[in-house]
Amino acid sequence: MLSKQIPLGIYEKALPAGECWLKRLTLAKELGFDFVEMSVDETDERLSRLDWSREQRLALVSAVAETGVRVPSMCLSAHRRFPLGSEDDAVRTQGLEIMRKAIQFAQDVGIRVIQLAGYDVYYQQANDETRCRFRDGLKESVDMASRAQVTLAMEIMDYPLMNSISKALGYAHYLNNPWFQLYPDIGNLSAWDNDVQMELQAGIGHIVAVHVKDTKPGVFKNVPFGEGVVDFERCFETLKQSGYCGPYLIEMWSETAENPAAEVAKARDWVKARMASAGLVEAA
């Protein structure tokens, strides 16, 4: 795997739903992916993973060892429901406890990167106080992550607070900690009024992984590849020329589709063709 040009992964929510990780990783391997990104979202079902027993955690580690397909990253979107910027102390405390559990979980199962959602609050009105609480919550979270040697990486969002790499870099400079980095989503980055290529270049040295999806202005999910505004080839070329050698993750939500594997295979082929045009992978 280390000799490949780039590692290519698939988001858990692109694959059939269920809690059997051996099946999920086996399917990902059959589809030609190097890794799967786990989702811990705001649903009780996925949040409960943070309370897995020792045996359940070992089953995930065993599935990785058996298949050779890694689970190196977690998309932690549970903070929509329990935001670090909440003015409700009980909600904010729960958000910090979720962060602590996620970092401990990552340490236990070998996850290296936790992607954070850049919302001070999501279902409430933001203000100066929510942003201040969010910054303080990030500082506390990064302190915990440092002790565990787990990287927290901020996603570029569908939300004005964190809708550019430049804004996320402001937090990186504020925190000034090697365990806080950036995890841009080229779809989200392209849906706003950003100079996308300049933004990607600005993030080099801090980008630990890249989400790959298509978007339209105001539409951040479920846009079929090729039907949105993202200039994939230019993004891939910019990242390559800037020296980025890390993983790319195809982000999809096809777990409830009639045939998720077919949807994923179609998207994989489309993305890899653009990667080949940019010189990231060999043409099929």
From Swiss-Prot:
<dbReference type="GO" id="GO:0016861">
    <property type="term" value="F:intramolecular oxidoreductase activity, interconverting aldoses and ketoses"/>
</dbReference>
<dbReference type="InterPro" id="IPR023492">
    <property type="entry name" value="L-Ru-5P_3-Epase_Enterobacteria"/>
</dbReference>
<dbReference type="InterPro" id="IPR004560">
    <property type="entry name" value="L-Ru-5P_3-Epase"/>
</dbReference>
<dbReference type="InterPro" id="IPR036237">
    <property type="entry name" value="Xyl_isomerase-like_sf"/>
</dbReference>
<dbReference type="GO" id="GO:0019854">
    <property type="term" value="P:L-ascorbic acid catabolic process"/>
</dbReference>
<comment type="pathway">
    <text>Cofactor degradation; L-ascorbate degradation; D-xylulose 5-phosphate from L-ascorbate: step 3/4.</text>
</comment>
<dbReference type="Pfam" id="PF01261">
    <property type="entry name" value="AP_endonuc_2"/>
</dbReference>
<keyword id="KW-0413">Isomerase</keyword>
<dbReference type="GO" id="GO:0034015">
    <property type="term" value="F:L-ribulose-5-phosphate 3-epimerase activity"/>
</dbReference>
<comment type="function">
    <text>Catalyzes the isomerization of L-xylulose-5-phosphate to L-ribulose-5-phosphate. Is involved in the anaerobic L-ascorbate utilization.</text>
</comment>
<dbReference type="InterPro" id="IPR050417">
    <property type="entry name" value="Sugar_Epim/Isomerase"/>
</dbReference>
<dbReference type="InterPro" id="IPR013022">
    <property type="entry name" value="Xyl_isomerase-like_TIM-brl"/>
</dbReference>
<protein>
    <recommendedName>
        <fullName>L-ribulose-5-phosphate 3-epimerase UlaE</fullName>
        <ecNumber>5.1.3.22</ecNumber>
    </recommendedName>
</protein>
<comment type="similarity">
    <text>Belongs to the L-ribulose-5-phosphate 3-epimerase family.</text>
</comment>
